[in-house]
A protein has these predicted regions:
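Bacterial Sec-exported substrate-binding components of ABC uptake systems
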Residues: 2-8, 22-89, 195-231
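Solvent-exposed, polar/charged alpha-helical surfaces in well-ordered, non-transmembrane soluble domains
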Residues: 78, 85, 89-92, 133-137, ...
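A short, structured surface patch at a secondary-structure boundary
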Residues: 79-138, 142-151, 261
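Structural recognition of the beta-strand scaffold that forms the well-ordered cores
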Residues: 81-83, 101-104, 142-146, 169-173, ...
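Alpha-helical, coiled-coil/dimerization segments enriched in small aliphatic residues
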Residues: 107-109, 241-267
């Protein structure tokens, strides 16, 4: 199997991409390109918002199949269920931890200060087994998560089913089954800021992310030659693993002059077909 290496900057963006694809999206990018102390400083300096959200606020989100849905938010949410670690992290970093009424168990053990923050939240259980009834019992006025991963009939229910119950949903743009752009990573942060009426804090944070992403892109723009073949794999605490691909991960790989060796993710990977795919890099 061939061995190739990425530049330091490209490797950094690859790490960002993996986080975005597996358990961390918009705010995971933040975690990869900004330190907790920088975030805390940004939040502290933006305690008074110069912009106010005008409610009702309507944003376009996407369901599990990539269909556009107009979602209306009547007020700043006070009881939020976060089905995705990245969204939970983002709420904490924007000073909104007190709004969280429920989360799901993490796929893997967390490290650092964020681990203690997350551990103090009310976990409803494993995302594979939490019922819609359990979710509704928290009486959420907003549910956050990835559209393709969580908002299906076989998981916690569709976006439309919660909309019919009068419970607004926000699905990450960066996770949607649509043609992706790196802009969606930052746009998710801005949208959360608008939904919660903390625009100044969120926009300051988003601007900081954009600057770091732009700097990384400048460093990797010189990558040339044959695209590197990359295989992304995610391991879990129970010892299982899956290969991974998504619209956003493909978008980021293209920026690195690379491509995923899989058309789609799955858990049926064997040593034999791994060898036959002959990836240049396994992340």
């Amino acid at each position: 199997m061939k061995k190739k290496t990425l530049s330091v900057a490209a490797a950094a963006l690859a790490a960002v991409m993996l986080a975005t694809g597996c358990s961390q999206t918009a705010s995971s990018v933040a975690s990869s390109v900004a330190t907790s102390s920088e975030i805390a400083s940004s939040v502290a300096e933006s305690t008074v918002s110069a912009e106010e959200t005008s409610y009702p606020l309507t944003l376009q989100i996407y369901d599990a199949d990539g269909n556009a849905v107009d979602m209306t938010y009547d007020h700043a949410p006070e009881k939020v269920l976060s089905t995705q670690l990245s969204m939970t992290e983002l709420l904490i970093k924007l000073g909104l931890k007190d709004t969280i009424v429920g989360v799901f168990d993490n796929d893997n053990a967390l490290k650092g200060d964020i681990a203690d923050e997350i551990a103090s939240l009310n976990s409803l259980g494993d995302k594979k087994s939490v019922s819609k009834e359990t979710i509704l019992a928290t009486e959420p006025d907003l549910i956050l998560g990835k559209g393709p991963l969580m908002f299906t009939e076989s998981s916690i229910g569709t976006v439309q089913s919660y909309q019919e119950l009068g419970i607004p949903v926000y699905t990450e743009l960066a996770s949607a089954s649509i043609d992706q752009s790196l802009d969606n990573i930052v746009e998710d942060v801005r949208n959360i800021g608008e939904i919660f009426n903390v625009q100044e804090t969120a926009n300051s944070y988003a601007d900081e992310l954009q600057e770091r992403i732009d700097a990384l892109m400048d460093k990797v723009s010189s990558q040339s030659g044959e695209p590197l073949k990359v295989l992304f794999m995610a391991g879990y605490a129970d010892g299982t693993f899956v290969a991974y691909n998504s619209k956003m991960s493909s978008c980021m790989l293209n920026a690195l002059n690379a491509e995923n060796v899989l058309d789609k993710g799955g858990n049926g990977l064997t040593l034999e077909n791994l060898v036959s795919m002959n990836p240049d890099i396994i992340v």
